């Protein structure tokens, strides 16, 4: 099993404190978001991890991953960036956004499924947008 992590966004909505830094490289408790992801992927036996990068790709210095640079990231949406790795979508593969922290049990539940396609959804996602004046629920799919 392989994993593809989409990290080609420009982080337009991120805090000024970490501008020009990919969101996945923001540290939380001394570890980057993508390092949390890689730990979980290792625990479930993922063999190869492909990280699709865009702007600031030179800031990624992760070991044991293969990089795919989306040369057209400014013209692509998330699906366009994912298509840069289409040759790796042929077999069993996990696909993630690079700025989401998830628990091991979520990936274990996905892997137990017998379905061809499985999508993990936070059913309480709307609570994250309550009271916001910036980055409203209308932007949730972006």
Language-model features, listed with the residues they occupy:
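Short, acidic Gly/Pro/Ser/Thr-rich loop/turn segments
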Residues: 11-13, 126-127
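Canonical Radical SAM [4Fe-4S] cluster-binding loop centered on the CxxxCxxC motif
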Residues: 16
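Conserved N-terminal catalytic core of the sugar/cofactor nucleotidyltransferase
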Residues: 1-5, 13, 27, 31-95
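The conserved acidic donor/metal-binding loop of glycosyltransferases
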Residues: 98-101
